[in-house]
From Swiss-Prot:
Free-text note on domains in this protein's UniProt record: Heparin-binding motifs (HBMs) are characterized by an XBBXBX or XBBBXXBX sequence, where X is any neutral amino acid and B is a positively charged basic amino acid, and are defined as the consensus sequence necessary for protein-heparin interactions. HBM1 motif is necessary for spore adherence to host cells.
Entry keyword set: Cell adhesion, Glycoprotein, Signal, Sporulation
GO BP: cell adhesion; sporulation resulting in formation of a cellular spore
UniProt name for this protein: Spore wall and anchoring disk complex protein EnP1
Glycosylation sites: N47
Subcellular location: Spore wall; Spore, Perispore
Species name: Encephalitozoon cuniculi (strain GB-M1)
Source organism, top-level taxon: Eukaryota
Motif interval(s): HBM1: 150-158
Source lineage: Eukaryota, Fungi, Fungi incertae sedis, Microsporidia, Unikaryonidae
Length: 357
């Protein structure tokens, strides 16, 4: 009853509140209500009378979908619904239907008015006008809030998904000012290939054991050596049934040389790694596009993938390899992502190598 009373009071004072979309971290995607509580906001109560305004808000903010925690007085905080910018409303699924945003409401006080407590949060009666970056006209926070004529309207700028051209490539951050050494770059995740093999006797009555094998491989290119001499030292670290370390020199035309050990037969480099200079430029171009450092991988078919942040996996599609004009990042999710990780990925890194290792 207490919760129902809060909802009634909140709905009666909704004109004094403004809609807001909270961006969720990876941990918050499966429990969006915690983000609403941490932001000191109220859960947005979606119903037939305000669903069109909510859809317009998503379209104006360039948000494809967002969680809603109430629908027609039904409490959905445990199992939220996902509202799309096209009007579709679908139930939450942790594998196939998640969102990066959650809709909530926060106080929108009018200047000179007293704030009223709504459900434990401060709601108000003033007008703070908001406009969305790139929108044609500003949208008022509330129709009830009337601002004095002699007072110039105040606009608060909200930037959602800023244009890549306005971004500055992110540099590694140093938190230890006392250390003069170079900052440690972001450690990329590893995705080993996991397979199961049956072993043991084939005789009747003897159960066969299942052995789980894990294998992974990381290619590291000394790109500075490539720029100076026209050759690049490639270090390949393999971890499978036994750890293996390989190092060889790759010329500009992709030929391997400098290996005189007949007992050590090097595995051929994948075709997509034969031009590390172009691959390094591609990685830097993607980092400028997304305005952050990314991790690069390839699969057994030599498809190129990047991991942006800790959650978003993309396949790199390049139609024009000369200037990357038609570069497209195609997101991999759901069943395809699980299958991709199951079959394993090879890491691709660039950096100076210690030749004494």
């Amino acid at each position: 009853m207490k919760l129902l009373g809060f909802l009634i009071v909140g709905l009666s004072a909704i004109s004094a509140l403004k809609t807001k979309a909270l961006h969720l971290t990876c941990e918050q995607e499966l429990r969006p209500y915690s983000a609403v509580v941490d932001a000191n906001c109220m859960a947005f109560a979606l119903n037939g009378s305000n669903i069109h305004e909510a859809i317009k808000y998503l379209q104006a903010m360039n948000i494809k979908k967002a969680y809603v925690l109430y629908w027609n007085d039904h409490d959905l905080r445990g199992t939220p619904m996902v509202l799309y910018d096209n009007g579709a409303l679908a139930p939450f699924d942790p594998y196939t239907n998640t969102a990066k945003y959650v809709l909530c409401v926060e106080a929108c006080p009018c200047p000179g008015s007293k704030a009223a407590s709504v459900g434990g949060f401060q709601a108000a009666t003033s007008s703070e006008k908001i406009y969305v970056e790139g929108s044609a006209r500003p949208a008022q926070c509330s129709e009830v809030c009337i601002e004095p004529v002699e007072r110039r309207p105040h606009y608060k700028k909200i930037v959602v998904n800023p244009s890549p051209s306005n971004c500055i490539p992110c540099e590694p951050e140093c938190y230890d000012s006392s250390s003069s050494s170079e900052c440690n770059k972001k450690r990329c995740k590893t995705f080993p290939r996991i397979c199961k093999e049956k072993c043991g006797s084939r005789r009747r009555g003897c159960p066969r054991k299942v052995e789980v094998l894990k294998s992974q491989k990381t290619y590291t290119f000394d790109i500075e050596k490539y720029r100076r001499r026209g050759e690049v030292v490639v270090r390949v670290c393999s971890k499978d049934s036994k750890e293996k370390f390989e190092r060889f020199i790759l010329s500009r035309n992709g030929e391997i040389r400098g290996n005189n050990n007949k007992n050590c037969i090097l595995e051929p480099l994948p075709k997509c790694l034969r031009c590390p200079g172009q691959l390094h430029k591609l990685k830097k171009h993607i980092e400028r596009k997304v305005c952050q450092e990314v991790c690069m991988y390839i699969n057994a078919k030599c498809d190129i993938f990047v991991l942006v942040g800790d959650c978003d996996f993309y396949r790199v599609v390049v139609n024009d390899r000369r200037r990357y004009r038609n570069l497209h990042l195609k997101k991999v999710r759901g069943h395809k992502l699980r299958e991709l990780i199951k079959h394993g990925l090879f890491g691709v890194e660039f950096g100076p190598l210690d030749l004494d290792r």
